[in-house]
Amino acid sequence: MKLLYIFEKNIILRKILITFSLIIIFLLGRYVPIPGVLISAYKGQDNNFATLYSTVTGGNLSQVGVFSLGIGPMMTTMILLRLFTIGKYSSGVSQKVQQFRQNVVMLVIAIIQGLAIAISFQYHNGFSLTKLLLATMILVTGAYIISWIGNLNAEYGFGGMTILVVVGMLVGQFNNIPLIFELFQDGYQLAIILFLLWTLVAMYLMITFERSEYRIPVMRTSIHNRLVDDAYMPIKVNASGGMAFMYVYTLLMFPQYIIILLRSIFPTNPDITSYNDYFSLSSIQGVVIYMILMLVLSVAFTFVNIDPTKISEAMRESGDFIPNYRPGKETQSYLSKICYLFGTFSGFFMAFLGGVPLLFALGNDNLRTVSSMTGIFMMITGMSFMILDEFQVIRIRKQYTSVFENEEN
């Protein structure tokens, strides 16, 4: 009874235990085999980017399992829905309708991705349409289960869907340790050392920019003491965080799923395969597009996380204002310029730090997996701060009690 009382009263302990339990379920599901499919017989294993993408989105293609799709379908759905609702307000749409739309789009995306992966499986006693459809259905179901686990964690635990992605990426990087040692022994000592040093520098800069902020002076009408001169609006230098990396991989990988399906339908058409170079990190075109997308998404996520429109409206309603800028459109325009400035800055530095190793490894299949390490660990660093910030908010909130709370409790 005492343990149950502690579990009920200690919100931090309760959230940690719930998150830990959900992570265990998530990790176990990654290794639950699909009936009729040969484990570790994914015919697309030579596609290092597909395996990397599955790791980034919490999936696992290095060993075929129920959760091989990860949260990829949900991420693609979020991108598509956001693209089609740019400039539109969804406040008039009920939560139920929004959820229905999201589930329908996610189902279509999951079926496309599931079919593309299931086609690349090797099956016991040969291929059949029944086995293909069964494997696809299981993969789609697994994607929805992961989405459900992430939503449970967001409501009752720490980190939401983010912590599942971080855990999946860490497990994937641990699996790459033997490859690093093997390359080190095969004469790639200098390249490995340079990659590791570059990754450490990138992580240090990521931490520095993540904790740096630009302070905009704000006149608070509700403050009538000496603190009025110290009031400011903090704008993070890297407001996009590490999310841009994950969504870049999503945008690059989804067209590859389409190409896989088209290639299976039209196996004699060589033009279909040629389009793959534009979305693969093993080609110069793919790396350049990767860096461009990184810049664009960094700016986009900066606007999403800061939202100048909402901030300017909230300031106008409260009576607060930025010196030398009129409330409303003028304030919104000023904040938008700040977002463009820092979004472009963070986009350039992340594209440069994540793209240079990929350019260096072009033409060398042995170094391709190691070269992606920089972007992965920058992503882990950015997402870890998101989780730590959530933990900090709960810890601070726990220090304050309700005015009406009985002192004996």
From Swiss-Prot:
It is found in: Cell membrane. It comes from Streptococcus agalactiae serotype Ia (strain ATCC 27591 / A909 / CDC SS700). SUPFAM superfamilies: Preprotein translocase SecY subunit. It is a multi-pass membrane protein. Part of the accessory SecA2/SecY2 system specifically required for export of possible cell wall proteins. The central subunit of a protein translocation channel. The keyword DNA-binding does not apply. The keyword Membrane applies. The lineage of its organism: Bacteria, Bacillati, Bacillota, Bacilli, Lactobacillales. GO terms for cellular component: plasma membrane. One of its GO terms (biological process) is intracellular protein transmembrane transport. This is Accessory Sec system protein translocase subunit SecY2. Keywords: Cell membrane, Membrane, Protein transport, Translocation, Transmembrane, Transmembrane helix, Transport. Component of the accessory SecA2/SecY2 protein translocase complex required to export cell wall proteins. May form heterotrimers with SecE and SecG subunits.
